[in-house]
Amino acid sequence: MKNIKQLLDYAYTNPNAAIKYTASNMSLWIDSDAAYLVAPKSRSRVAGYYYLSDTPKQPIQANPSFNAPVLVECKILRFVQSSSTEAEIGGLFHNMKTALPLRETLAELGHPQLLTPVKTDNATAHKFAHDDIKHARSKHMDMRYYWVKDKET
């Protein structure tokens, strides 16, 4: 009932709301974010915004033409994170795993995927994913986050 009320409130407040999709090459893009220690029991929240745009150029442009999202993912991480960087890497891990079936579906529909650009707003998490950080200082991070490095896009 609460969700229905929220939807009706949104529809009343935004009577001219629209979702806009423009023609693109159907390449999947991800915008990943995390909020550190904002949920109960010292947990962190992650969000993923998955949208389709043109094929990325090299180097990947910072601001592609945005379409409305094909998927928006919000979740609370199960484990307590020890830093904002670890929360961001947890968000990258979750969002990149969520993108795998989307990439496969797009490929099966005739839109092969090259790189899937993933944007994060944390410089340390970006450096960690691109192997530009000293490993001795990142040992506190769980081994499952090394998956992000293996799947680096």
Specify the residue positions occupied by each region the protein language model found.
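RNase H-like nuclease module associated with reverse transcription
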Residues: 78-153
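A short, polar/acidic, helix/strand-boundary loop motif
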Residues: 54-90
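C-terminal reverse transcriptase regions that engage the nucleic-acid substrate
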Residues: 1-16
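Short acidic, Gly/Ser-rich segments with clustered Asp/Glu that frequently serve as metal-coordination loops
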Residues: 34-43, 48, 124-126
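Two-metal-ion RNase H-like nuclease active-site motif
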Residues: 21, 26-41
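Beta-strand segments within the central parallel beta-sheet cores of soluble alpha/beta enzyme folds
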Residues: 2, 20, 115-119
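Residues immediately flanking
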Residues: 32-34, 54, 120-122
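A short acidic-Thr-Gly-centered motif at the start of a beta-strand
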Residues: 16-26, 107-111
